[in-house]
């Protein structure tokens, strides 16, 4: 009985070895040799595999760069590596790279513990996604930050952290690569990737679409859709009780004035972003 079992085990092991050898031979026979240039392109990439470029990962992006003609190549961008990496790849291909505008994530909410105090106690799983399924919000704002830091957990570059005093995320502009993981993760769509214009940004830090009086009861920093910003720049959209500043609006030309004129300080204007690392 034992000898028969032992024989069966040996047969199975033998078959496994034979199968492994056959698989190896087959893989070598049909192996696709990489071009030295394609290999060099892959090695030039940051290997973050974040998907911010729109491809499955760095290997997929390297293949796309290698196969691209001049027009296609100019449309390819590596947000993590930036212009330095794309210039290196362009040199390898003997092509010109497209222009890359610096961008970073912004949090379109200023629902801090002070501006939007808790009105309900949440005792469930400490996750934004979990909390979002069972309640409108700790402060009563149905669109505000839930303050559990799901975004922080998915940021692989250490660009996000929770401010213990305010309760909302802090963005380190020097580390943000615009990979978009925070945009995908936030159940309330509070993150947006926006351009940095000469070290400046301007945006509305609110997504509450309740009427002004109601919104202000839940958060003192809520947009009241007064329309003052739209009078400064007609490109600004005010609808559904909320203002939105398109990325075509110049932060350099209008940013400071827009922030100063906003009566509830819902418009945030950032400057000297090369030196100032954090959003407060």
Where does each model-flagged region fall?
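Short, recurring structural edge motifs at helix starts
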Residues: 220-221, 246-250
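Short recognition patches in nucleic-acid-associated and regulatory proteins
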Residues: 235-246
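Ferredoxin-type iron-sulfur electron-transfer modules and their immediate structural context
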Residues: 2-169, 173-175, 181-227, 232, ...
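Surface-exposed, short loops/turns at beta-strand junctions within beta-sandwich domains
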Residues: 250-256
